[in-house]
Amino acid sequence: MRNNAITRFFSEYSALGHVLEGRDLLALARATVLQSPAILRTRKLTSIDASMSRNMNVRFGKARMAMPLADIDRILAARNDNPTFGNVREMYARNCYLEHLRLQTPLDAVLDLGANRGMFSLLALLALGAKTVVGVEPVEIYGPVFRLLLEANGCEVSRAPRYTKFISCPSVERQNPDQTVSIETIMREQGIDRFSLVKMDIEGHEQAVFSEPAWLAHVDNLTMELHPEFVDDLHPISKALEQYGFKWMSFDQAGHQVNIQSAMFLYASRTSSLVA
């Protein structure tokens, strides 16, 4: 297990070398030395993430994004949230949402379901050139964090509308319109006919969203984190994707292609954008 922790760290360390600037790589090296006992003891990188709570710039492809991590973590301190550098590792260094998609950019409209701090929304705006990114995130405290990210990167708020609701299907939305919103309503209210990309990380709510899958007819590409701990049977997701003409692949946390019920990430496309 100790060897697994070491292997995982050095794999992520290598990936971080492609996104961090020199001074932040040096800070990472220092944090590695200081936190190595905690890493080996816990087999987690949380201590590194906490040590790297500093304002920095991150590269993703040709894009350079301002990441005020220290400011974000101060906002989220009352919620006892995970240090935001962990999101940098997973989303930008590991490229967990786009690793198996080769998208033709710039994109038009992007839908970020489970938008959290808004770091994928920012990536879509700056690195993928999205015209509009609609976010859905029910936790209110992430709203100020996202506005901070937009301001730090000179992005207009009008390009990134956000719903502070749970995403669900139309039938659930009709029963509880104050707390839930459907993709169909988002498209109608935002005047969007089609999404170039949908990113989804909604902690088990995918079961309801895919129970009424007509929205897939208006989507080109999909990337999602799966939650088998919350959803007993994920196969309706793959069936719905195939019904609407998508090719898809699913992978475990280590990056091995596996069946959907054992997977953590799923990538789907009907624009021939999938890569193994």
Question: Language-model features: where?
Answer:
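Phosphate/nucleotide-binding beta-alpha loop and adjacent structural elements of enzyme active sites
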Residues: 1-276
